[in-house]
Design a protein with these regions (language model features):
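Phosphate-/nucleic-acid-contacting segments
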Residues: 12, 189-254
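Cyclic nucleotide-binding regulatory module and flanking cytosolic helices
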Residues: 6, 15-65, 109-110, 114-117
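Short loop/turn motifs at secondary-structure junctions and domain boundaries
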Residues: 52-53, 69-73, 193
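Cyclic nucleotide-binding regulatory domains
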Residues: 42, 67-129
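Polybasic "coupling" helices that flank or enter modular domains
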Residues: 146-213
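Cyclic-nucleotide recognition modules
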Residues: 50, 100-164
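Short aromatic/basic micro-patch
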Residues: 45, 103, 135, 202, ...
Length: 254
């Protein structure tokens, strides 16, 4: 672990050497963090020199659907940012049972609480679509947290917002009935992921069950009931919300 005993950043490049990947050839598609349109919003608090430090210590990788970006239990040597595509974050439970936490979107920081607890990834991240991702040396993050108060506060806000969202989900999953839980998921994809009432359902029925804590058969049955009652239209992977007010009511009443 690297510790820095001063608060200014005049000699940052003498402390952290730019990322060296040995003999592996890597071509970055993003020219720099400064010009990236999908960069994490908290980077706005960095000085130009600090942002250059981040840029010098990152590398990009492209993943196909189904490939693992981060593995639960592996070392947290890097922070992950997605430049494009969608991925699922999930806990690998016992007996092959997974619990999907959220859908990872471009421009978001992917860094679990384990980074500051046991230096292990708390969950697995797998690509749903083709994904272009940036990996940034976690020691750079530790350094910036120590020397840049605004950046540190932004990181705390990010982690706190995710923790609050997870707590809310846990309460809803424990207190709502199956119809309410599935309504929550459909609204999540509409409001957060796609921002549209009509979208391609990127999760299988099995994965929807892993997200809502119910069996695949229950997901199929409730989707059919919602369609028969005119609340949604469902055709293979396509979902269209026809009666948003009714779906919200189902979500609220659980």
């Amino acid at each position: 672990m690297i510790f820095v005993s001063f608060a200014d950043t005049r000699n940052l490049k003498t402390i952290f050497k730019p990322f060296n990947n040995g003999n592996m050839s890597v071509v970055n598609l993003i020219s720099s963090c400064e010009t990236c349109t999908r960069r994490w919003k908290n980077f706005q608090h960095l000085t130009k020199e600090e942002l250059n430090l981040v840029n010098d210590n990152r590398y990009e990788a492209t993943f196909k659907p189904g490939e693992i970006l981060m593995k639960q239990g592996s070392p947290t040597s890097n922070a992950l940012f997605m430049a494009s595509g969608l991925a699922k974050t999930y806990i690998e439970g016992q007996n092959g049972k997974n619990f999907i936490l959220s859908i990872a979107l471009p421009g978001r920081l992917i860094l679990g609480p384990g980074a500051y607890v046991d230096s292990r990834h708390t969950y697995t991240v797998a690509a749903i679509t083709s994904v272009q991702a940036c990996f940034i040396n976690f020691e750079i993050f530790r350094h910036l947290v120590r020397v840049n108060g605004a950046f540190a506060e932004g990181l705390l806000e990010d982690i706190s917002a995710k923790s609050l969202g997870s707590l809310t989900r846990m309460v809803n999953l424990s207190q709502k009935k199956m119809h309410g839980r599935l309504a929550d998921a459909l609204l999540y994809f509409s409001d957060i992921v796609f921002k549209n009432d009509e979208y391609e359902m990127i999760l299988s029925r099995q994965e929807l069950g892993e997200m809502t804590n119910m069996a695949k058969e229950c997901v199929v049955r409730i989707l059919k009931e919602l369609e028969d009652s005119g609340v949604i239209y469902s055709d293979s992977s396509k979902i269209k919300i026809l009666d948003r007010d009714k779906l919200v009511q189902i979500s609220v009443k659980g």
